[in-house]
Amino acid sequence: MKRKRRQDTKHAVYMLVNTNTNEAYVGITVCGNDVKNALKVRFQKHVRRAVTENKNWALCRSIRAHGAEAFVVLLVDIVRGRKPAHAYERDIINGDVPALNSH
């Protein structure tokens, strides 16, 4: 018999801040036990997408204009479960309206 998949995996809610413009982006990623590595890998994915996919999203434009070195990655919180993590992320985005959360 297959084990039931866990519904309460840990998610990191994070913020990317452009230190040149003080603009921010809020996102989430599954983090497991290695939060630091999960955030590093997720930021690398953002950078790779900005450079290779030529998306016209605010975050991608900012990464292309200022470079990855202009950004700092901040851990906002760790939330158990996908639905609560997404809800928490939406609450932050709707409350603060980060400039780089647009696509």
List the predicted regions and their residue ranges.
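Structure-specific nucleic-acid interaction/processing domains
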Residues: 2-103
